[in-house]
Amino acid sequence: MKKSQQSALRRLAVTTLVTIASAVTAVTTQAAYIVNATEVGGDVVFEGSGSIDTAAWSFNADRNRSAFVQPNESFTVGASLAADYYSGAFSGPATIGPGTAFTTADSRTGDYTGINWNFPALFLPSGYVSGQPIAGTATYAAATFATLGITPGSYQWTWGSGATADSLTLNVGAVPIPAAAWLFGSGLLGLVGVARRKARA
């Protein structure tokens, strides 16, 4: 392969990788709150992080709550007992499993955050500022998805439109890989293939 061809291939590779990386970054930095629930060492652990835009919601009241899950109604994470309750409207699933029991987490950390799809309502840390990064966990000792009454899968609630559009996602079990990540992997494989073909030429 001539040096000019090698240089052109390198430029193509760099340009492609930068484009793909930008797409991945755009996906991961979009305002949203994501909770991943996993079975770990005989426990079930909910881990949430992100931010929430409250522009499409109305502050309702202060509440004192502890992290819990009730599959047919709501779930929350976080250690703070003091929380702000927001009312509004959103689209999303009406259940995350067949269970109906209210189960309080055995241990919890971080910012109190959650959703109730029956009211509907959002629970956020007391004094929460819209768009502020938050994170929280809830651990259910000696539990499984089945004993908590939740079904593995991905659940998403969305609200607002345009600049105020936002979402809360709960992934129960395996965490899905974003489409941009698949694009990134496909791009890398494609570049490897091109390089090999050029090398043989």
Task: Show where each model-derived region lies.
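Structural signal for the C-terminal ends of transmembrane alpha-helices
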Residues: 194-197
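Mature extracellular "passenger" or substrate-interacting domains of secreted, surface-exposed proteins
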Residues: 32-174
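Short, threonine-centered small-residue motifs that mark membrane-proximal processing/anchoring sites
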Residues: 7-34, 161-189, 200
